């Protein structure tokens, strides 16, 4: 299949998280957390003191790491850096927006879902 992006195969990859404390702790208790040899974690806990700049930096760092396959973002945090999330176009790491305890999930704001809807609507139109 010419023109398709290849996804490198590896034995293991990490899930990164940018979310509120309760969400991150839940995933850490499930065994998703990691601290590498340079003491870098695969998560950022966002609270009222976290700046948008820190969130942007964490997103850029996680999306550039080759050991991360998925980045989980609480949707309300993704809305803070929507321009970065919407402009991200690589297949790996995949960006998934998730709900949080205090902020419900709204499919209208999910950039991945809107891209899929556009793809299927464009595909269905081109097949007619």
From Swiss-Prot:
Key words, A-Z: Hydrogen ion transport, Ion transport, Membrane, Transport, Vacuole
GO cellular component: cytosol; Golgi apparatus; plant-type vacuole; plasma membrane; proton-transporting V-type ATPase, V1 domain; vacuolar membrane; vacuole
Bilayer topology: Peripheral membrane protein
Pfam families per record: ATP-synt_F
Main subcellular location: membrane
Gene3D superfamilies: ATPase, V1 complex, subunit F
Entry-linked InterPro entries: ATPase_V1-cplx_f_g_su (IPR008218), ATPase_V1-cplx_fsu_euk (IPR005772), ATPase_V1_fsu_sf (IPR036906)
GO molecular function: proton-transporting ATPase activity, rotational mechanism
Keyword flag ATP-binding: no
Compartments it resides in: Vacuole membrane
Superkingdom classification of source: Eukaryota
Keyword hit for Transport: yes
Family: Belongs to the V-ATPase F subunit family.
Subunit annotation: V-ATPase is a heteromultimeric enzyme composed of a peripheral catalytic V1 complex (components A to H) attached to an integral membrane V0 proton pore complex (components: a, c, c'', d and e).
Reported function: Subunit of the peripheral V1 complex of vacuolar ATPase essential for assembly or catalytic function. V-ATPase is responsible for acidifying a variety of intracellular compartments in eukaryotic cells.
Name of the protein: V-type proton ATPase subunit F
Organism of this sequence: Arabidopsis thaliana
Gene that encodes the chain: VHA-F
């Amino acid at each position: 299949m010419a023109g398709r992006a290849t996804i490198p195969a590896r034995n293991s990859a990490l899930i990164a998280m940018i979310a509120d404390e309760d969400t991150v702790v839940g995933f850490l208790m499930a065994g998703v957390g990691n601290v590498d040899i340079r003491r870098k974690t695969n998560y950022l806990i966002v609270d009222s003191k976290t700046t948008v700049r820190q969130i942007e930096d964490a997103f850029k760092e996680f999306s550039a790491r080759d050991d991360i396959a998925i980045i989980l973002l609480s949707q309300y945090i993704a809305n803070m850096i929507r321009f970065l999330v919407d402009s991200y176009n690589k297949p790996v790491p995949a960006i998934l927006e998730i709900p949080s305890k205090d902020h419900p999930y709204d499919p209208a704001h999910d950039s991945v879902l809107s891209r899929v809807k556009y793809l299927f609507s464009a595909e269905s139109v081109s097949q007619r």
